Amino acid sequence: LVEQYSFDLKHTLIMETGGMKGRRKELIREDLHEQLATGFGVEHIHSEYGMTELLSQAYSKGEGLFSCPPWMQVFTRDTTDPFTFLTEGMMGNLNIMDLANRESCAFIATQDLGRLHPKNQFEVLGRVDHSDIRGCNLLVY
């Protein structure tokens, strides 16, 4: 849409909820946000991070750091040793514990790379090389 038109939506919150899911060329999140912000005439693009297997989502207010609700915790683990959990600032695979999933599996090991930050925040750096494309809209095929 923003490739063909420009908008003045400066009083609007624009939420990005994921990548191209293999349907178009994948863009780096920062580049996508820059294109969307310019095209929609807004200062920041907000983001949502979640998946079908979880009941909770994390949100970013446009600075690239996702915040979790109190019942959701994100961990990073070493990419070569799944038993080694990493500290803040270190890049690793994201693992999520969502206590809202109390009647199902509350622990998810993703194929997303990320980094932990203070105050229960994290950033998503991309997907692990050669990982499956994810996204519930791909189930239609």
Tell where the protein language model's regions lie, with residue ranges.
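Active-site glycine/GP-rich loop and adjacent strand/helix microenvironment
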Residues: 1-141
